[in-house]
């Protein structure tokens, strides 16, 4: 099932490119303890939220995450699907490269509710994020970002220890 979903996501990436407002990202994820992972995402840039402010942008991200924890003798993996709206605002420039702050709260579906010695109690989790992103390239089509992610069920069911991650991301717009 995992391979089918991943294959479907990868097949859909090229079709998003014809939209002109799409892109993809690849994140290296590092969590508490020995948690590591990768996040593959497709994103759609919805543009400015002009009813709020012309300089606040919105993009939608759909992602698949693969997490690993522990040594070979005590190894644990998890698989996550997520969809998240993300607000973006330029906060400055560094050597002519635009610097952005981004924040979002989305929904995720976690395959295994026990991961990295934590019981998160529900398969459905909120995916909160806060990050810094820099654009570069001739048309600012390349992005690098550092993001903090927190997964939690918002206290709907106990226990709710949450899972925290830092991600280093490369994004490309079409």
What are these model-predicted stretches?
Residues 30, 44-46, 50, 89-91, ...:
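Residue-level signature of outer-membrane beta-barrel architecture
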Residues 28-34, 44-46, 62-68, 105-111, ...:
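Transmembrane beta-strands of outer-membrane beta-barrel pores
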Residues 34-38, 77-83, 122-128, 162-166:
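Residues that define the transmembrane beta-barrel architecture of outer-membrane proteins
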Residues 17-21, 47-56, 92-99, 138-141:
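Short loop/turn motifs that connect adjacent beta-strands in outer-membrane beta-barrel proteins
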Residues 22-26, 54-62, 99-105, 142-146, ...:
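Transmembrane beta-strands of outer-membrane beta-barrel proteins
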Residues 27-28, 70-74, 115-120, 153-156:
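Extracellular loop and loop/strand-boundary signature of outer-membrane beta-barrel proteins
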Residues 40, 136, 162-174:
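Outer-membrane beta-barrel "beta-signal"
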Residues 1-21:
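Cleavable N-terminal export/targeting peptides
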